[in-house]
A protein has these predicted regions:
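Hydrophobic membrane-insertion alpha-helices, especially the h-region
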Residues: 7-21
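Structural microenvironment flanking redox-active thiols in thiol-disulfide oxidoreductases
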Residues: 76-85
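Non-catalytic, surface beta->alpha helical segment in thiol-disulfide oxidoreductase systems
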Residues: 98-122
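Structural micro-motif
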Residues: 84-100
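Solvent-exposed loop/turn segments at secondary-structure junctions
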Residues: 50-54, 75-77, 92-93, 103-105
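Positively charged n-region of N-terminal signal peptides that target proteins for export
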Residues: 1-5
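Local sequence-structure signature of Cys/Sec-based thiol-disulfide redox active-site neighborhoods
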Residues: 24, 28-70
């Protein structure tokens, strides 16, 4: 009976520790939060699709700061078509970055290149 209490107590403590760690980690800012927010302030747009491996790689460069990216999803839900917003902008490859001066670059861009192109501090 004592072994059962010890096991249950250990499981509860472990579950509590895991819950605290998940909460703590989620509440911490991402490494590139300010950089991603700056891109949006500089009127940069990031066109991509959920099925594009290069788009996923580009987002992964930002880690959990990717939620602040000025991202525009171009794919229909079934992955077989392009949404009107991207069609109207003549987006033909992914990822496509559009800058305030109207210039565009397609493909995975390094964070350093984005910083240089936009003036956003990395």
């Amino acid at each position: 009976m004592n072994m059962k209490k010890i096991l249950v107590s250990a499981l509860l403590v472990g579950a509590g520790a895991i819950g605290w760690w998940i909460y703590y980690d989620a509440s911490q800012p991402g490494k590139y939060d300010a950089f991603a927010k700056c891109l949006e302030e500089k009127e940069v747009l990031f066109y991509g699709t959920f099925w594009c491996p290069h788009c996923r790689n580009q987002k992964a460069m930002f880690g959990k700061s990717d939620k602040y990216l000025p991202y525009i999803e171009c794919s229909t839900a079934d992955g077989k078509g392009q949404l009107p917003i991207c069609n109207e902008q003549n987006i033909s490859g992914y990822p496509t970055w559009e800058f305030a001066d109207g210039s565009r670059e397609t493909g995975e861009l390094s964070l350093a290149h984005l910083a240089q192109k936009t003036g956003c501090p990395l």
